[in-house]
């Protein structure tokens, strides 16, 4: 299996370019459809064995997606399944029509027009529409899709569920087939890894159909680096961070966290716990003076700077803090209504990497141009609401594209949090983390991530492995902990304290 093909995310136009290159090189269209259909049939037969799913209904649309599904229908029929084909309208593509005729010649049943209220199937195969759909599905297909969704019968979708945008993952017009499994052919379609697709996708499975790594590089050029999955093997390759035998506390990262307020006192503790798990040699905390004793008692190894606080309990200033001596600075968790000048000072004076999270993002909004003047890396970690405050003109329907645009504009790394967190580099590379758990939908989870990011950045000259490693580690630990404590049992403190046990359990 090609590593590049396993992680590259493509849109409809890129798929068309790849297929055109295959056909120009001599691959017959018929051979590609046959190969795709055979791979689909084998996967579906394995995942849905005949003992539990003897009766299969195959939904056939007007194009080549329907042709792939008809190959599946033929193969399942030939091994003894009861197969019915539902074809509201005859296929437009001649090749798909030929497969339909052949299926009928074998004695297969084909239904045109309306589907019976009780079709008598144990499994649907959705081959109505594939990639490139740009508008809501019309009748008679829309009614059929609604009927399938209401049937309660599992659906195996070909390439992507019918009705989904292959770019944004949204259900066009609000209607798509709700799949139990989606068998993506060749390269991953971008839309399958957008948050909007999660309600429709089921379990995503990728099937190889013949794209080689050389062909992908030849056709897409540098575009093959524009969007990819953050695969676990690559993300955790450098974790835990290696240390030479001669390491000392000042050589393995000095980190400053600027966090907390009277209203959000726990945030300072959580960012510090997340940072501690990342293993910086020295951890400094700049906190409102009212929080200093409490946090120092919880993290005795941290060096705490009690700082003046305003009447509202927010951090007022950083007296005596030399921002040039830190390898990384984290700012924002729980800051509350601090002054914008505080964050602007950090952006201008911090010599090391800078992570802005939570209130740090809100305070830098409208002043992002200051980030372009920084020599060291900057990482912005917004959730969708914070993203809209930072970049009000960038639509979030395409989260991958939005993160990329924001990164290019701000000259910063963007960690766009969500069910599938998107990471974009200042050069425009995009990664989507396929892992994670709704267990992380808890206040304070982001504070832990901010601290972990800062800790790894403080120890890495190259920000890429630090950012990608932290995003993967945080999400994967959440999954691991949810499996042990249930989805309701992963509060932010449990997450922070579980980071290192997870990494030890997941290690070689």
Curated annotation (Swiss-Prot):
<keyword id="KW-0630">Potassium</keyword>
<keyword id="KW-0413">Isomerase</keyword>
<feature type="binding site">
    <location>
        <position position="162"/>
    </location>
    <ligand>
        <name>K(+)</name>
    </ligand>
</feature>
<feature type="binding site">
    <location>
        <begin position="417"/>
        <end position="421"/>
    </location>
    <ligand>
        <name>ADP</name>
    </ligand>
</feature>
<feature type="binding site">
    <location>
        <position position="447"/>
    </location>
    <ligand>
        <name>(6S)-NADPHX 2</name>
    </ligand>
</feature>
<feature type="binding site">
    <location>
        <position position="126"/>
    </location>
    <ligand>
        <name>K(+)</name>
    </ligand>
</feature>
<keyword id="KW-0479">Metal-binding</keyword>
<dbReference type="InterPro" id="IPR004443">
    <property type="entry name" value="YjeF_N_dom"/>
</dbReference>
<dbReference type="InterPro" id="IPR017953">
    <property type="entry name" value="Carbohydrate_kinase_pred_CS"/>
</dbReference>
<keyword id="KW-0521">NADP</keyword>
<comment type="function">
    <text>Bifunctional enzyme that catalyzes the epimerization of the S- and R-forms of NAD(P)HX and the dehydration of the S-form of NAD(P)HX at the expense of ADP, which is converted to AMP. This allows the repair of both epimers of NAD(P)HX, a damaged form of NAD(P)H that is a result of enzymatic or heat-dependent hydration.</text>
</comment>
<feature type="domain" description="YjeF N-terminal">
    <location>
        <begin position="15"/>
        <end position="217"/>
    </location>
</feature>
<dbReference type="GO" id="GO:0046872">
    <property type="term" value="F:metal ion binding"/>
</dbReference>
<feature type="region of interest" description="NADPHX 2; for dehydratase activity">
    <location>
        <begin position="383"/>
        <end position="389"/>
    </location>
</feature>
<dbReference type="InterPro" id="IPR030677">
    <property type="entry name" value="Nnr"/>
</dbReference>
<keyword id="KW-0511">Multifunctional enzyme</keyword>
<keyword id="KW-0456">Lyase</keyword>
<dbReference type="Pfam" id="PF01256">
    <property type="entry name" value="Carb_kinase"/>
</dbReference>
<keyword id="KW-0520">NAD</keyword>
<comment type="similarity">
    <text>In the N-terminal section; belongs to the NnrE/AIBP family.</text>
</comment>
<dbReference type="GO" id="GO:0110051">
    <property type="term" value="P:metabolite repair"/>
</dbReference>
<dbReference type="InterPro" id="IPR036652">
    <property type="entry name" value="YjeF_N_dom_sf"/>
</dbReference>
<feature type="binding site">
    <location>
        <position position="159"/>
    </location>
    <ligand>
        <name>(6S)-NADPHX 1</name>
    </ligand>
</feature>
<feature type="domain" description="YjeF C-terminal">
    <location>
        <begin position="232"/>
        <end position="506"/>
    </location>
</feature>
<dbReference type="InterPro" id="IPR000631">
    <property type="entry name" value="CARKD"/>
</dbReference>
<dbReference type="Pfam" id="PF03853">
    <property type="entry name" value="YjeF_N"/>
</dbReference>
<comment type="similarity">
    <text>In the C-terminal section; belongs to the NnrD/CARKD family.</text>
</comment>
<feature type="binding site">
    <location>
        <position position="141"/>
    </location>
    <ligand>
        <name>(6S)-NADPHX 1</name>
    </ligand>
</feature>
<feature type="region of interest" description="NAD(P)H-hydrate epimerase">
    <location>
        <begin position="1"/>
        <end position="224"/>
    </location>
</feature>
<keyword id="KW-0547">Nucleotide-binding</keyword>
<dbReference type="GO" id="GO:0046496">
    <property type="term" value="P:nicotinamide nucleotide metabolic process"/>
</dbReference>
<feature type="region of interest" description="NADPHX 1; for epimerase activity">
    <location>
        <begin position="130"/>
        <end position="136"/>
    </location>
</feature>
<feature type="binding site">
    <location>
        <begin position="437"/>
        <end position="446"/>
    </location>
    <ligand>
        <name>ADP</name>
    </ligand>
</feature>
<protein>
    <recommendedName>
        <fullName>Bifunctional NAD(P)H-hydrate repair enzyme Nnr</fullName>
        <ecNumber>4.2.1.136</ecNumber>
        <ecNumber>5.1.99.6</ecNumber>
    </recommendedName>
</protein>
<feature type="region of interest" description="NADPHX 1; for epimerase activity">
    <location>
        <begin position="64"/>
        <end position="68"/>
    </location>
</feature>
<dbReference type="GO" id="GO:0005524">
    <property type="term" value="F:ATP binding"/>
</dbReference>
<feature type="binding site">
    <location>
        <position position="334"/>
    </location>
    <ligand>
        <name>(6S)-NADPHX 2</name>
    </ligand>
</feature>
<feature type="region of interest" description="ADP-dependent (S)-NAD(P)H-hydrate dehydratase">
    <location>
        <begin position="232"/>
        <end position="508"/>
    </location>
</feature>
<feature type="binding site">
    <location>
        <position position="65"/>
    </location>
    <ligand>
        <name>K(+)</name>
    </ligand>
</feature>
<dbReference type="GO" id="GO:0052855">
    <property type="term" value="F:ADP-dependent NAD(P)H-hydrate dehydratase activity"/>
</dbReference>
<keyword id="KW-0067">ATP-binding</keyword>
<dbReference type="InterPro" id="IPR029056">
    <property type="entry name" value="Ribokinase-like"/>
</dbReference>
């Amino acid at each position: 299996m090609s590593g590049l093909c396993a992680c590259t995310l493509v849109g409809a136009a890129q798929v068309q370019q790849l297929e055109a290159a295959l056909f120009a090189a001599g691959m017959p269209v018929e051979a590609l459809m046959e190969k795709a259909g055979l791979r689909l049939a084998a996967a579906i037969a394995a995942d849905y064995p005949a003992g539990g799913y003897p009766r299969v209904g195959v939904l056939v649309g007007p194009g080549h997606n329907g042709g792939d599904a008809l190959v599946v229908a033929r193969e399942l029929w030939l091994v003894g399944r009861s197969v019915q084909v539902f074809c509201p309208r005859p296929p437009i593509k001649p090749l798909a029509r030929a497969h339909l005729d052949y299926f009928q010649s074998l004695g297969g049943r084909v239904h045109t027009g309306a589907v019976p209220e009780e079709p008598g199937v144990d499994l649907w195969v959705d081959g109505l529409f594939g990639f490139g759909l740009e508008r809501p599905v019309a009748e008679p297909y829309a009614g059929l899709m609604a009927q399938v969704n209401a049937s309660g019968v599992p659906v195996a979708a070909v390439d992507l569920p019918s009705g989904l945008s292959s770019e944004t993952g949204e259900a066009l017009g609000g209607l798509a087939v709700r799949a139990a499994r989606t068998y993506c052919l060749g390269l991953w379609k971008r839309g399958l890894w957008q948050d909007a697709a999660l309600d429709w996708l089921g379990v995503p499975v990728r099937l190889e159909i013949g794209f080689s790594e050389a062909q992908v590089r030849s056709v897409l050029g540098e575009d093959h680096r524009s969007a990819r999955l953050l695969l676990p093997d690559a993300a955790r390759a450098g974790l835990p961070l290696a240390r030479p035998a001669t390491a000392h506390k000042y050589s393995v990262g000095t980190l400053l966290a600027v966090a907390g307020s009277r209203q959000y006192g726990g945030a300072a503790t959580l960012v510090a716990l997340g940072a501690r798990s990342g293993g910086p040699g020295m951890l400094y905390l700049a906190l409102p003076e009212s929080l200093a004793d409490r946090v120092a008692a919880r993290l005795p190894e941290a060096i705490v700077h009690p700082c003046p606080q305003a009447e509202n309990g927010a951090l007022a200033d950083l007296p005596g803090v030399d921002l040039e001596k830190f390898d990384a600075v984290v700012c924002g968790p729980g800051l509350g209504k601090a002054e914008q000048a505080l964050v602007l000072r950090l952006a201008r004076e911090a010599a090391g990497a800078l992570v802005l999270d939570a209130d740090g993002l809100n305070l830098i909004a409208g002043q992002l141009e200051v980030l372009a003047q920084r020599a060291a890396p900057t990482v912005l970690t917004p959730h969708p609401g914070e993203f809209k405050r930072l970049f009000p003109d960038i639509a979030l329907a395409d989260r991958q594209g939005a993160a990329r645009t924001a990164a290019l504009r701000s000259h910063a790394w963007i960690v766009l949090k969500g069910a599938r967190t998107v990471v974009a580099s200042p050069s425009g590379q995009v990664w989507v983390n396929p892992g994670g758990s709704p267990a992380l939908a808890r206040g304070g989870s982001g504070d832990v991530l901010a601290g972990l990011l800062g800790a790894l950045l403080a120890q890495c000259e190259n920000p890429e492995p630090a950012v990608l490693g932290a995003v993967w580690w945080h999400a994967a630990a959440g999954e691991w902990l949810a499996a042990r404590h249930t989805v309701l049992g992963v509060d932010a403190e449990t997450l922070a304290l579980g980071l290192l046990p997870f990494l030890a359990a997941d290690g070689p």
